[in-house]
């Protein structure tokens, strides 16, 4: 099957936003207008096409990023709908990694919200060009220019309107195009009857003003345009469009569109914007990777005749076809039934079937081409972040970094039958979601699951029940504390056993020093003259890493320390890797007395939005939770309080906020950093853990 759409006419985009800004509804409308869906699905009715997991339809939020493909004006647009809830940040992170551009959806009343800041930061990290869609223009309190201002104030983004709304709230009837300098009027609620008209007289001056501002903003980024502008020459529509496209692709400029997806207004013009301003796979730099054996850096051009390379960005278990691996093809082509190399794991994999996904309905295809996003059936070894490539041209593309989980709960199967199925369910869920971990506590024998927040774990337990038919009891949440050292010290670890038969001998001197917060564990071998033979050094490092899993204070993992192996001794006959491993772990235990170990706890960045009259109560409540208020601002007639609060104090906060504000307050939180636990609280935690 030949290529249906050229690379120039392909767009790989994501739709990202704060929860409830209307991402899924926007995607639904895109699918409706591109002829993919015959009846529009509504999120609040639980029938949206992209929200295809049962839990999503019940909760009205998007959890997994469903990938779908649509066609518009001779272009193929591959869309990934990403969740806006902070607990699912990893889904956003992994879809951004494989996208070429994105639409950021804002709520016209709220503008930029906390989760918008998080996803915006992530998109900036990956250098993803964006256009902005100010949605919900029909909502009470909708204010387009306020929303644009929040882009400048909160994100320092060089964002300018390429459209203006005609009216707002229930008077929102049309849109002015500031590039073409014309207007569009909507005649009905399905938004299909759209008429191109002259700009209404009473909007003429405003349109001229913002047209001028747009040209000025774009000219600043384009020398040729700047010269014409300064010399007073007329800038044509084509020149303006080309300059906006160039600046957007260079991530220097963000065009802002407006509309109401729910009322079907502005979506077709937004699709035009995707085609006009977001990059094709050819417009962005070729992806770079490393040749495994030589560590040499290479580029993989987005061409069908280049060697095949792709990145697996999502694993899903499908009830009908089993394990689905979603991947983005960066170069070359791939046929179903062929073999590829998973260069990350050095395993050969056979591609069973290739599927193009449309939310949850699938179409089988025989070949995928450079720039495509598709799913494969039959990959056994591949997990999220792995590179798939041509067997003769190995390359490893940059993988993805995932945050460590910050919350854990113990779960117990309700019956013996559940116990057998639970292990399998947890394994499959871990394959799908790299921020979800499950392990058995060696001391209590309990199964502990860890994730990014309470909602994340709720949904995991829910999925176990529905998809894997596992009933489980869930314990109270536990915080992922860590331990670290405050002081430096030189410590000895000696393991000697010589009683009949072959003995054991391992002896090390290690200098422990505190490392910067967040830098993790660093090991240095400073042995001179072979007092500890080279072959035992890795055993010393492994012994330390193992011992660090159970800290000296309260059994929590030890982080952010440096260990320098500088002396020791060995025995020709009795020394072994095992002996040195044990000696190293003894050194770590001995360090407890000298290095002043302390407990660390996760601190969450919290943003609470409340009516002004509750401000005093909420501030008092945050302080009582050991929180530090970092700032406040008015947003419309509400107050926004930003604070840093220990995670341990945030359990059940949703309920308490509801009762404190008669249900009128909302909050969001995201993990920020680890900080030392105050001594009186640390003592209690240590006591509890030692069962005193």
UniProtKB/Swiss-Prot annotation:
GO terms assigned for molecular function: GTP binding; GTPase activity; translation elongation factor activity
Gene Ontology BP annotations: ribosome disassembly
Predominant subcellular localization, coarse grouping: cytoplasm
GO cellular component: cytoplasm
Lineage: superkingdom: Bacteria
Pfam families: EF-G_D2 (PF22042), EFG_C (PF00679), EFG_III (PF14492), EFG_IV (PF03764), GTP_EFTU (PF00009)
Localization of this protein: Cytoplasm
UniProt keywords, alphabetically: Cytoplasm, Elongation factor, GTP-binding, Nucleotide-binding, Protein biosynthesis
Residues of the tr-type G domain: 8-282
Binding, GTP: 17-24, 81-85, 135-138
CDD domains attached to this UniProt entry: EF-G (cd01886), EFG_III (cd16262), EFG_mtEFG1_IV (cd01434), EFG_mtEFG_C (cd03713), EFG_mtEFG_II (cd04088)
Family per similarity comment: Belongs to the TRAFAC class translation factor GTPase superfamily. Classic translation factor GTPase family. EF-G/EF-2 subfamily.
Matching NCBIfam families: EF-G, PRK12740.1-3, PRK12740.1-5, PRK13351.1-1, small_GTP
Function summary: Catalyzes the GTP-dependent ribosomal translocation step during translation elongation. During this step, the ribosome changes from the pre-translocational (PRE) to the post-translocational (POST) state as the newly formed A-site-bound peptidyl-tRNA and P-site-bound deacylated tRNA move to the P and E sites, respectively. Catalyzes the coordinated movement of the two tRNA molecules, the mRNA and conformational changes in the ribosome.
Record protein name field: Elongation factor G
Organism encoding this protein: Geobacillus thermodenitrificans (strain NG80-2)
Gene name linked to the record: fusA
């Amino acid at each position: 099957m030949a290529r249906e759409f050229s690379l120039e006419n392909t767009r790989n985009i994501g739709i990202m936003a704060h929860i409830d800004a209307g991402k899924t509804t926007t995607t639904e409308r895109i699918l409706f207008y591109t002829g993919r869906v015959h009846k529009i699905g509504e999120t609040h009715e639980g029938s949206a096409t992209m929200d295809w997991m049962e839990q999503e339809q019940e909760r009205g939020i998007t959890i997994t990023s469903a990938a779908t493909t649509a066609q518009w004006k001779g272009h193929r647009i591959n869309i990934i709908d990403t969740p806006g809830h902070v607990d699912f940040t990893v889904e956003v992170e992994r879809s951004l990694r494989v996208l070429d551009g994105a639409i950021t959806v804002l709520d016209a009343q709220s503008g930029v919200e906390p989760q918008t800041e998080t996803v915006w930061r992530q998109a900036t990290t990956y250098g993803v060009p964006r256009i902005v869609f100010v949605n919900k223009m029909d909502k009470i309190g909708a204010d387009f220019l306020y929303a644009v201002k929040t882009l400048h104030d909160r994100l320092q983004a060089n964002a300018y309107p390429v459209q203006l709304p005609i009216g707002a709230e229930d008077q929102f009837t049309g849109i002015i195009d500031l590039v073409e300098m014309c207007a569009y009027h909507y005649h009905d609620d399905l938004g299909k009857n759209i008429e191109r008209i002259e700009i209404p007289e009473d909007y003429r001056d405003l349109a001229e003003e913002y047209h001028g501002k747009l040209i000025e903003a774009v000219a600043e980024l384009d020398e040729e345009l700047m010269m014409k502008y300064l010399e007073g020459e007329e800038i044509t529509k084509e020149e303006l469009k080309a300059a906006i496209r160039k600046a957007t692709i260079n991530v220097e400029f963000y065009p802002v569109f407006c509309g109401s997806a729910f009322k079907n207004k502005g979506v077709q013009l937004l699709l035009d914007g995707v085609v006009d301003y977001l990059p094709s796979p050819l417009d962005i730099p070729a992806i770079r990777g490393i040749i495994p054996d030589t560590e040499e850096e290479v580029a993989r051009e987005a061409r069908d005749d280049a060697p095949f390379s792709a990145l697996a960005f999502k694993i899903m278990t499908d009830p009908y076809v089993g394990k689905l691996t979603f991947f983005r093809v960066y170069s070359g082509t791939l046929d179903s039934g062929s073999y590829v190399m998973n260069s990350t794991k050095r395993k050969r994999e056979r591609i069973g079937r290739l599927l193009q996904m449309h939310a949850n309905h699938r179409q089988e295809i025989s070949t995928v081409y450079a720039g495509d996003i598709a799913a494969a059936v039959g990959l056994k070894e591949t997990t999220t972040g792995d590179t798939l490539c041509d067997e003769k041209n190995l390359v490893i593309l940059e993988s993805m970094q995932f945050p460590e989980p910050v919350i854990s709960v113990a779960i117990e199967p309700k019956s013996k039958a559940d116990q057998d199925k639970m292990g399998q369910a947890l394994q499959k869920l871990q394959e799908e979601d790299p921020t979800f971990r499950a392990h058995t506590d060696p001391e209590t024998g309990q199964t502990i699951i860890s994730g990014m927040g309470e909602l994340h774990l709720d949904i995991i337990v829910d999925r176990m029940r529905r998809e894997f038919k596992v009933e489980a009891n869930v314990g109270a949440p536990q915080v992922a504390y860590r331990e670290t050292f405050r002081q430096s010290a030189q410590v000895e670890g000696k393991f000697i056993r010589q009683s009949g038969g072959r003995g054991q001998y391992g002896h090390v001197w290690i200098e422990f020093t505190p490392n910067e917060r967040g830098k993790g564990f660093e090991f240095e071998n400073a042995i001179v003259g072979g007092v500890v033979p080279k072959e035992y050094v890795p055993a010393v490092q492994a012994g330390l890493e193992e011992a660090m899993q159970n800290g000296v204070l309260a059994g929590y993992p030890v982080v952010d320390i440096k260990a320098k192996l500088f002396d020791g001794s060995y025995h020709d006959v009795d020394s072994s890797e095992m002996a040195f491993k044990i000696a190293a772990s003894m050194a770590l235990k001995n360090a407890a007395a000298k290095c002043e170990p302390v407990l660390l706890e996760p601190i969450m960045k919290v943003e609470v939005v409340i009516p002004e009259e509750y401000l005093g109560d909420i501030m008092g409540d945050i302080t009582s939770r050991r929180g530090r208020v970092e700032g406040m601002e008015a947003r419309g007639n509400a107050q926004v309080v930003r604070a840093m609060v220990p995670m341990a104090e945030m359990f059940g906060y949703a309920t308490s906020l509801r009762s404190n504000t008669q249900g009128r307050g909302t909050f969001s939180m995201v993990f920020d950093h680890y900080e030392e636990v105050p001594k009186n609280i640390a003592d209690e935690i240590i006591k509890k853990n030692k069962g005193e």
